[in-house]
A protein has these predicted regions:
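Short beta-strand segments enriched in hydrophobic/aromatic residues
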Residues: 41, 53, 108-110, 150-153
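A solvent-exposed, acidic/Ser-Thr-rich amphipathic alpha-helical stretch
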Residues: 46-112
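Short, low-complexity N-terminal intrinsically disordered segments enriched in polar/charged residues
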Residues: 17-47, 51-55
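Bacterial N-terminal signal peptides
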Residues: 5-14
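A generic structural micro-feature
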Residues: 83-86, 123-129
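Short beta-strand edge/turn micro-motifs at domain boundaries
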Residues: 101-105, 128-160
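Short, surface-exposed loop/helix-turn segments at secondary-structure junctions
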Residues: 117-123
Length: 160
């Protein structure tokens, strides 16, 4: 009798876990991470960006890969002395075919302008680039983290 009750309790727990995962909105949770990345990157918040990745997460851009949170953090912090950036995220497509995993593609338009002490808006001639982020996500305990991100450039602005 005790074995039967334990079996029923275990079955109820497993069904509850399965239902919880099926009702989890991967698109909403992982889209939020995509937007958070853009904002934190523009603020040169290296720790904030690094925390959006798994411990062993990777970010690849222009043939260079940064692996692990520390490397990702240092890449962002290195931009503190560079130009001002704005990453504008538009189209986001997130799909999950396996519990705990998701894939996504998002479009990004990047504007770059010179850093200045002025409070006036920065003048730019056009976007610096338009591309796609190809992401693999891991979802654990309701939190979506980037396992890998690759930037694929599509258009660049050419000064004439």
């Amino acid at each position: 009798m005790l074995l039967r009750l334990l079996s029923i309790a275990l079955l109820g727990f497993l069904v509850g876990c399965q239902q919880q995962d099926q009702s989890f909105d991967y698109s909403e949770a992982c889209s939020s991470v995509v937007h958070d990345y853009a904002y934190l990157r523009d603020q040169t918040d290296g720790q904030g960006v690094a925390n959006l990745f798994t411990d062993e997460g990777s970010f690849s851009i222009f043939g260079e890969t940064f692996s692990g949170r520390q490397a990702i953090k240092q890449r962002v912090l290195g931009a503190e002395v560079g130009p001002v950036t704005r990453h504008l995220i538009s189209t986001i497509d997130i799909e999950s075919k396996t519990p705990g995993k998701a894939r996504g593609v998002s479009y990004v338009t990047v504007y770059i302008g010179p850093r200045s002490d002025s409070t006036n808006p920065i003048e730019v001639e056009g976007f610096a680039g338009i591309g796609e982020y190809h992401d693999r996500f891991v979802v654990d305990a309701g939190e979506c983290l980037i396992e890998s991100r690759e930037f694929i450039p599509v258009f660049t602005y050419q000064d004439k």
